[in-house]
Amino acid sequence: ELDKKKLPPIIADGESGFGGIYNVYELTNQFIDSGVSGIHFEDQLASEKKCGHVGGKVVIPTHEYIKKLNAARLSSDVSGVPIIIIARTDAMNAKLMTSDFDDRDSKYLSKNRTSDGYFLIENNHEMAIAKSLNYAEYADVVWCETNTPDLGFAKEFADEIRKSHPNKILAYNCSPSFNWLDKFTKKEIENFQSELSSYGYKLQFVSLAGFHSLASSMYDLASKYKGGNMSAILELQQFEKDLSKDGYTGIKHQQEVGGNYYERIGEALLGDESELLSKKDSTENTQF
């Protein structure tokens, strides 16, 4: 019943692969079975994995991460399902690296080590670009996680990558971890996405947008509803009905959680006239 042309692609967060190359291979296979169109993996140490906007991050050597990208690609090839592989580096803001074995990384490291045995990174800026240049040969899209929405660095990064890989797609996280209100004027915000796009950032997204939207809207609804204000629910339903004109389907919550799917199973097993079927007395069907 679904028109696949209308289904937006899903890009899955593969984190750091949850282990080594075998974990990445199997995880990619499971994502493919689930129907994703793309997966992004980051170059953090899996056992110390953290959000890209907090401290304590540890990145792994370039050669080790490339093996993970190859594991994901092999899984895709064996499955016979082409997917988009996105390489993300956290080197721009990480302070630690597991090893100085890879010469491509060692020049950016201090000789000093932490009490946990990790090497300190001295030049994050150049390391992030260098790592991404190496990753670009093995990934469809390259993403450098940053701790500020800096158009200057975004352009520098893009220029360096596209010197060697002129058609490489770049990704940018317009993260809610950034305090956008304090950093840009209204005019600058209006032009931010088009500026990024002109540099080559064709994949722009807001990580955790769903969380912030859901949390704030639920808080707003509860605040209005408290004290017996039923108009809050009416406003919500009217908002949903207006969105339905543009393809929004969430107003039918039974449908969204699989009601139609199980109804079809019930029809096959019980018959169309069974009194146990849910659609006959469904308020969702009669009122929406």
Show which residues each predicted segment covers.
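Alpha/beta enzyme core
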Residues: 1-172, 176-178, 182-205, 219, ...
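Substrate-binding cleft of secreted/luminal carbohydrate-active enzymes
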Residues: 194-223, 229-263
